[in-house]
Each structure stands twice: as structure tokens, then as C-alpha cells.
Amino acid sequence: MQKYFLVFLALLSGAPAHAALNVFACEPEWGALAQELGGDQVAVYTATTALQDPHHIQARPSLIASARKAALLLCTGAELEAGWLPVLLRQSGNAQIQPGRPGYFEAAAYVQMLEIPARADRAQGDVHASGNPHIQTDPRNILLVANALAQRLAQLDAANAAFYQARQQ
């Protein structure tokens, strides 16, 4: 019996547990895409639901705590989350997911923006100076973002790079 127990312990110690890559998705469409590309290699937390307006989210303590644990922050960008994302990033204290770092990913950076206004001021109402941030409504954009996201997942989790690239195909 003791021999079997020792063999069991040896097997456990020889196979280190793999921790999933924590992904913080600002909107459900990006959470779904990250889950599709990452499978069981990612743990996705989605900050909003399809019933919420992503323009008007509050950086609640629960969101900040989830962002604090993330290796990748995945948002639309193009000012869609401008009302709450800067506060969330600052309060999270997570250097990995700050703008300019590999853990910060804005989907809008990988597509051609439409409806960019010639001039933007408050007299025109809620105008996005970077263009229409609702990029997920065009399926061609999803493919462009998926390609870039698979590369970013591979960069952040090099041990599973082939897995992410295969799922992107």
C-alpha cells in the first residue's frame, strides 16, 4: 500500500498544475471571444452584461478586484469605456494591464474606425472623437480582433502559444 501511495505522490509532483490566464473583458462580446480562443487555458471575467450600457458603468470594488488579478484586460477602446476604465485601471494597481503594456488590449486598435467626426464637441451630444466604438456589430471586425487577440494570448502565455493559434484558425 505504501508503495502505491509513493507512486501516486511522485505522479502528482511531476505534473505541475497549470494556472489559467486571467482575462478581464470589459464587454460580453470580448469575453466570449477570449473564451473561444483560450478554452480551458483562460479564466474570463466579464465586467458588463449585454443588458448594460458600457458607456455608464461604475468602477465598483468587485470590478477593481477582478482587474487586479488579470493578466489581460480586453476592452473595446475608442473611448467606449472612458467613463470608468481609467478609474478601474488606477485603482487596480495592476501594472500588467496598464496602457502600453502587453496585458492591455483595445479591440478598436485592430479595425478601421468608422464615423470619425470632423469636429467633436459637447454641443453635438455624445460624440466619440475616435469614431463609432461599436465595432462588434461588423463580423469582419471580429475576425480582425480574433487574429490580434490570439497573438496577444500567445505572447502572454508562450507555453500555450500553439494552442491559441490553432483555436484561432
What feature does the model see in each segment?
Residues G14-H18:
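N-terminal signal peptide c-region/cleavage motif recognized by signal peptidases
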Residues A19-Q169:
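Extracytoplasmic metal-acquisition and chelation regions
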